[in-house]
């Protein structure tokens, strides 16, 4: 009997080492780190203490990285400083709507620069982030909004039609439509 493992033609990582350019401070078994250097990204991760909150991690990074890019998407970037400022504005806006700590806020967005701003703003306001798949049908969206009890929703304009079909069927009182 022949097994698949007897017929592999795979090259082991140790055999590939010679095919990558060598950089004195980049291990040859991790060639992707070269691109990290190009973009000024850390090549190692400093693990926070077990009791560190996500907000504490962001606060530390705001202070540490300021004007450096936090996110890059479709040719645009968002610095840590801008993320800090804009997410604080979102948090203040949510509070100005009368929403309270613990209220649920739905966010129906793909991976775009608006997402981290809104997500962090929701968390900073002490509210609960409800991620919503932007590809949901109106029936799926209605179910998630009802199930979560979301009182507000941030939605990219491309997906607003889906929400329009269910807007009168749930507890959502505040709708923020974002442009790309």
Residue ranges and their predicted role:
Residues 30-34, 39, 56-79:
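AMP-dependent adenylate-forming
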């Amino acid at each position: 009997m022949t097994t698949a493992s007897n017929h592999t033609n795979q090259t082991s990582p140790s055999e590939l080492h010679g095919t990558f350019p060598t950089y004195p401070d980049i291990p040859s078994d991790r060639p992707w780190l070269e691109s990290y250097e190009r973009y000024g990204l850390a090549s190692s991760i400093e693990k926070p203490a077990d009791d560190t909150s996500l907000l504490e991690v962001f606060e530390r990074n705001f202070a540490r990285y300021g004007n450096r890019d936090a996110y890059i998407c479709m040719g645009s970037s968002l610095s840590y400083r801008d993320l800090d400022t804009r997410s604080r504005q979102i948090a203040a806006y949510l509070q100005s709507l009368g929403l309270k700590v613990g209220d649920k806020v739905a966010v129906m967005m793909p991976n775009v620069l608006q997402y981290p701003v809104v997500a962090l703003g929701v968390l900073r306001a002490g509210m609960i982030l409800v991620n919503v798949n932007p590809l949901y049908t109106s029936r799926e969206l209605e179910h998630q909004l009802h199930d979560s009890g979301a009182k507000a929703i941030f939605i990219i304009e491309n997906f607003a039609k889906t929400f329009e079909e269910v807007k009168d069927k749930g507890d959502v009182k505040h709708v923020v439509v974002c442009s790309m």
